[in-house]
UniProtKB/Swiss-Prot annotation:
It comes from African swine fever virus (isolate Pig/Kenya/KEN-50/1950) (ASFV). InterPro entries: MGF_505 (IPR004858). It is found in: Host cytoplasm. Belongs to the asfivirus MGF 505 family. This is Protein MGF 505-7R.
Length: 528
């Protein structure tokens, strides 16, 4: 069974206007000194069919009046008991508080609902075991500045003064602007810089700006927080680093208002690949070509991304004035990406870089560079010859051509393309060391001997003649005669003398006849 009272209390409908007070009391729908009360919709009630209140506002009013019957009714209508307790605290109706005390698990949960500081404190006092610090923490969370003002002297007391920093951090984290300002104006904050870290993490520009107001306007003026120019600069640089790292351009610009360095911001942006920051500052701060080149060196040194390098190069139209310094950073940091970008824009610094590498670096660096840029063996060898780097030529040639005969064959081709005599002789010397270190087939040695004759390599040819003499066959005789013919054509007397000497040996040994010798020299005289 159900009663008419239950039906009326649990449902939403309008009451008839002719219901008398006694009837309403029997139905449990009468509020002393207010009149009839019924549920108008889910979250509202109507008093005397005219005044509309939210259920929770009505609960707070009932709590102030200590009307437990109305409180029970409104709780049936899904009201929040906390509002009734708040009303009771405000009016100090402790009987109602005692009645519902056991239903409150944590008195701190009521604090955000309270607007009045006195009621706020009364409520907090009901949390057994809490101290002044706990009250101040919740005052900050609930933006109750007046409570902090009330306990200012306590905060300055040595017993709790060390807690100022944690309260300041809490105010920053909960973004209580008025409280932050008040703390900055009235209390000695041990580490006011915390506000900047929190502002950057939460991306709160207003909080970031407020930090400077506290440090430079309030604390420094009052002598609480002294900053020398050096410390001020360090502080601003740190803030720039944080802001750029997060890509927060407005924060970077804010530091400039207090003396932050544009160059510092650009350097950080380059290292962190923050292109939006770079682009804005370059376009709005009148950055010189020289400064951009310095940023480019930094980008190379720190291995910045392709997009960052491209952006910096675009500002100077891909034309670097101080190539030497750029190459210093490229090779010093083993960072060659910029060379590839310039090469794509028809700016070739690869040869210059390779020359520097060959001259000053190790075999491994040179090999890596050659492979990275697909440099032809001929180009590398010519540079190495110019720099007189015989060891590195030998080692890299061994990597390229494992077969010594093939190695000699390619090197001979390169010798023919070198235009200056000293370079040709240098490479011929290397070829000869390869010959000395390996056992070549006779036909390869014969070809090498002919090559030496063509380039008038007297000493090396003389060395090979020993092999030719030891192989006293018809093949050897033919090569001696061919060498004589070439030496005669090119007028190399030293070579001719060596060949003549070995022809005499062959004649003495019976390998060559008098007629063959006469025929060879007859050809010589005919040419003369």
């Amino acid at each position: 069974m159900f009663s008419l009272q239950d039906l009326c209390r649990k449902n939403t409908f309008f009451l008839p206007n002719d219901f008398k007070k006694h009837t309403l009391q029997l139905l449990g729908l009468y509020w002393k000194e207010h009149g009839s009360v019924h549920r108008a919709e889910k979250d509202n009630i109507m008093i005397q069919n005219e005044l509309i209140l939210t259920v929770n506002d009505a609960l707070q009013l009932a709590g102030e009046e200590g009307d437990t019957d109305v409180v029970q009714l409104l709780l049936l209508w899904e009201g929040n008991l906390h509002y009734a307790i708040i009303g009771a605290l405000k009016a100090e109706n402790y009987n109602l508080i005692c009645e519902y005390h056991s239903q409150i698990e944590d008195w701190h949960a009521l604090l955000p609902l309270i607007q009045d500081p006195e009621t706020f404190e009364k409520c907090h006092e009901l949390s057994l075991g809490c101290d002044l610090l706990c009250l101040l923490q919740h005052a900050i969370k609930c933006n109750m500045l007046s409570i902090l003002v009330k306990y200012k002297e306590d905060l300055l007391n040595a017993r709790i003064r060390h807690r100022i920093q944690s309260l300041f951090v809490l105010a920053c984290e909960t973004r209580r602007i008025e409280i932050i300002l008040w703390i900055g104006q009235n209390l000695p904050i041990p580490e006011p810089e915390t506000i900047f870290s929190i502002a950057v993490i939460t991306k709160d520009l207003e909080l970031f700006s407020l930090g400077y107001k506290i440090i430079f306007d309030y604390m420094q003026r009052q002598g609480i927080f002294q900053l020398s120019e050096v410390v001020r600069k360090i502080l601003l640089n740190r803030h720039i680093d944080m802001a750029v790292n997060k890509g927060l351009l407005p924060f970077v610009l804010e530091t400039f208002k207090y003396g932050g360095s544009v160059k510092r911001a650009l350097s950080c942006a380059v290292m962190d690949n923050k292109r939006k920051v770079i682009d804005y500052l370059v376009r709005h701060e009148n950055i010189s070509h020289q400064t951009i080149e310095r940023l480019l060196y930094l980008a190379v040194k720190k291995h910045s991304s392709r997009k960052t390098l491209n952006l910096l190069l675009s500002y100077i139209n891909y034309k670097v004035k101080n190539i030497k310094k750029l190459l210093d950073h490229v090779l010093g940091g083993n960072s060659t990406l910029v060379l590839k970008i310039l090469l794509e824009k028809k700016q070739n610094l690869v040869d210059a870089a390779l020359t520097r590498l060959v001259k000053h670096s190790t075999y491994f660096r040179v090999k890596e560079f050659i492979e990275d840029f697909s440099i032809s063996p001929e180009k590398f060898i010519k540079i190495a010859v110019r720099e007189q780097k015989n060891v590195i030529i030998k080692v890299i040639c061994e990597d390229i051509w494992e077969n010594p005969a093939e190695r000699i064959r390619y090197l001979k081709q390169i010798v023919s393309s070198i235009k200056y005599e000293s370079g040709r002789q240098f490479l011929i010397n290397i070829i000869h060391t390869i010959y000395q270190s390996h056992s070549l087939k006779p036909e390869e040695i014969f070809k090498l001997a002919t090559f030496y004759v063509k380039h008038n390599a007297v000493t090396h040819f003389k060395d090979l003649c020993k092999f030719l003499w030891l192989n006293r066959g018809t093949e050897s005789k033919k090569h001696f005669l061919k060498c004589l013919e070439i030496a005669d054509e090119k007028d190399f007397p030293a070579i001719k003398s060596i060949v003549s000497e070995y022809i005499n040996y062959m004649f003495t040994a019976g390998t060559m006849t008098k007629d063959e010798i006469m025929q060879a020299y007859a050809s010589e005289y005919t040419m003369c």
